[in-house]
């Protein structure tokens, strides 16, 4: 098993190219199951979760080719199975996204109940009740979701009683091939939803309202293939910007999407950073200054993203003043706090908030990554901690960050991946 060894270095400085978004790429790859024509996806990040997804598709009998490092071509006309087994699904929650496409195209699907990061209950009931409203018959048996439909799914008005990105994605894909019009009420508004809708529209789907809380889908009988570039990763972008701010550096992120990061950029400016943006780049300048502590409350897009919460906890640890981070999306998402405390951070957990007394003097220590974004917060802490920090269990990190040690190293960080 690998770990990262990090030593305190100088401020980060330079340019880093942002990868395609994991959270956009995973549902995009599933759109291939809606058509018998080949689909080509570009700007796909090389990540553990992407490898899991392609393995899952191959298990279904789908042909998957990788003509270039960040390109994937999928031909689902060779599909042989509608069963997504426990062995693969247990490692990644997004595997549930095969359910809607398989059911819509094949009329049946058997999908193991999913796994992924251990950051609280993420129930799949919204996926299931939505599909049932479209005419699916579903039962959960021996750890598997077994779904079938006679003929095509039927368009329906579906109100989700809580905002769910995954359920919105699953139902959006299923509705693309349904008979009639589907209206998704209280839909998720994330940029990755818009990206998925744009890809489906390129394939011939009729969708309006993506990016709002009401999405309308007029079902069509068949979809075509696609040639589609994955949206830049706003969370990776935010992570590098926080790392630059914490180290007092100046970093430009290229191949970025500034309009997907409004809430994060606003908080970085509140922390004292100078932010400049172009059409596809963002630059943060914190040279000669120390961050100011900020108050952050996570909420569904377009508010502050929960996936940036851990990184801002680290920022508040070393900032001037007292900062408060309140988590409203997931319970049990402060597992990075005890690890930061091992490094000397003064953080108090109060209900669903992390209160950081700033100006902590962090010391290098062996720490353990507990989930994807928590591991990023520990890496950032290691960049400014005195001594040497060992971040263990970085398989979490590899699920969502492409070559993070190489990218940070290119900005001047002293970081290496070693075998334990």
Swiss-Prot record:
Residues noted as binding UDP-N-acetyl-alpha-D-glucosamine in the record, renumbered to the chain: 93, 307, 329
Known pathway: Cell wall biogenesis; peptidoglycan biosynthesis
Chief location: cytoplasm
Any GO MF annotation of the entry: UDP-N-acetylglucosamine 1-carboxyvinyltransferase activity
Keywords, sorted A to Z: Cell cycle, Cell division, Cell shape, Cell wall biogenesis/degradation, Cytoplasm, Peptidoglycan synthesis, Pyruvate, Transferase
Role played: Cell wall formation. Adds enolpyruvyl to UDP-N-acetylglucosamine.
Name assigned to this protein: UDP-N-acetylglucosamine 1-carboxyvinyltransferase
Organism: Alteromonas mediterranea (strain DSM 17117 / CIP 110805 / LMG 28347 / Deep ecotype)
Protein EC: 2.5.1.7
Membrane-spanning ranges: none
